Amino acid sequence: MRFDSNQLGNVEVDETTIITFPQGIPALENCTRFKLFHDITQPTPQMYWLQSLDDPGITFSLALPDRLGVRFQIELSDEEVAQLQLSGPQDAAILLMLYRPLDLDRDSHPVLGALQANLCNPLVISLSSRRGIQKTGLKIDILLHTP
C-alpha cells in the first residue's frame, strides 16, 4: 500500500511489515500501527524512522543502543512478554527514541543541532510477531569503564 507521510513523503508500505503497538505509545494511544524505515543505501543504518500509519504527521527518529555505544538489558514482566508474544530474548529489538532538546540559549540551527537519546523510555519490538511496547520510567545505571 502507499502511504503519504508528512516527513518521509509518499512511501510504499508492505502490510506484512507493519509493527503493532496494541496500546499505542504513551500520549499517542490512538496510534497503534507503525512502519519502520531506514536508509537502504547504508549497509548498517545509523538511524531509523518509525512512521505512524494512523497519523501521517507522527514520525519518530530511532537508533539501536549499540550504535550509540550503549548496552541495554531490560527486564520485562510476564505480561509484557505475553503482549509482545516474545519467543525469547533474541526475538526482542530495543530502539531508542532520538530528539532535539528545546534549548533556547543554543545558537545552533534547529535542524542541524545535536540529537539526544531517550534512555529511560526505550521501545521493545518483537521481531517475529511485529508487536511493540514502550517500556517507560526505567532507572538507568551507567557503568563506566576506564582504560
Swiss-Prot record:
Cellular component GO terms, alphabetical: cytoplasm
Entry keywords, A to Z: Bacterial flagellum biogenesis, Chaperone, Cytoplasm, Translation regulation
UniProt entry tagged with the keyword Chaperone: yes
Main localization (coarse): cytoplasm
Subcellular location: Cytoplasm
Classification via InterPro entries: Flagellar_assembly_factor_FliW, Flagellar_assmbl_FliW_dom_sf
UniProt-listed Pfam families: FliW
Coiled coil: none
Gene Ontology process terms (BP): bacterial-type flagellum assembly; regulation of translation
Keyword Transport: no
Family: Belongs to the FliW family.
Role of this protein: Acts as an anti-CsrA protein, binds CsrA and prevents it from repressing translation of its target genes, one of which is flagellin. Binds to flagellin and participates in the assembly of the flagellum.
NCBIfam families, alphabetized: PRK13284.1
Subunit structure, as described in the record: Interacts with translational regulator CsrA and flagellin(s).
Listed name of the protein: Flagellar assembly factor FliW
Organism expressing this protein natively: Chromobacterium violaceum (strain ATCC 12472 / DSM 30191 / JCM 1249 / CCUG 213 / NBRC 12614 / NCIMB 9131 / NCTC 9757 / MK)
Gene that encodes the chain: fliW
